[in-house]
Amino acid sequence: MRGILIAIEGINGVEKSTQAIRLKNALENKRYDVIYLHFPSPNTDTGKLILDVLNKIVKMPSEQLHELFTKHRCEFTAEIAALLKLNYIVIVDRYIWSGLAYAQADRIMIDTKNTFNPDYTFFLSPNKSLNEKPLHLQRLYETEEKQEIIFTQFINIINEVPKNKFCAIPANLNKEIIDKIIFSKTIKVFEKNLNLDYIKMYDGMYFNVHDLDLIHFDWQKCIEEDDGIDEEYGL
């Protein structure tokens, strides 16, 4: 028995954070245990540095920036592992898809070790031309040209993901409709995974939630190779 990891992804300006928070509130209203995480997070030194780079306060080579993003995601792996053990629904606003899409847009490969493969991902897709902010308001990656490249990389990722692991939603739908889609699918994923002990890692390994000891907390000891796990659990 474990919680689930739900990711909400998309390019800039499709209201990922809005939908993630609305999902959190809807689940809490139904008495579910929920945690919302946003990447990059200002709550760590790594996250603060990333935000300074994105806001063009600090300059950094692209390769170094993506290494920093990877490190930042891994900073939360232990926390997510504990929350899954405690049967929480963990909502992440940007996660590994964003890491891959933005890195690939810069023609950089990143390490996916120690990163969870979300149980389900919602991709908010723009179905109109992207609006470019005035130059003085643009953060790093926010030019229309760059966002188009990043969007293409997201589509490349989606094409490799099993169809039962994600849902693409037009971002300009009525918010109440988007709410219902995301909420209902999240509940279905939670109920489906109630009896599972494992969650898949993005590098193909598996994390055994059942064996995680929250007293002598060493989550890395619970990572296993696929020894029939995928076939047995349908992960």
UniProtKB/Swiss-Prot annotation:
Reactions catalysed, as given in the entry: dTMP + ATP = dTDP + ADP
GO process terms (BP): dTDP biosynthetic process; dTTP biosynthetic process; dUDP biosynthetic process
Phosphoprotein among keywords: no
Signal peptide: none
Pathway it works in: Pyrimidine metabolism; dTTP biosynthesis
UniProt EC number: 2.7.4.9
One Pfam family per UniProt: Thymidylate_kin
Binding site for ATP: G10, I11, N12, G13, V14, E15, K16, S17
One GO MF term attached to the UniProt entry: dTMP kinase activity
InterPro entries: P-loop_NTPase (IPR027417), Thymidylate_kin-like_dom (IPR039430), Thymidylate_kin_CS (IPR018095)
Keyword set, alphabetical order: ATP-binding, Kinase, Nucleotide biosynthesis, Nucleotide-binding, Transferase
Keyword Metal-binding: no
Class in the EC hierarchy, top level: transferase
Domain of life of the organism encoding this protein: Viruses
Main function: Catalyzes the conversion of dTMP to dTDP.
Family stated for the protein in its record: Belongs to the thymidylate kinase family.
Protein name: Thymidylate kinase
Source organism per UniProt: African swine fever virus (isolate Pig/Kenya/KEN-50/1950)
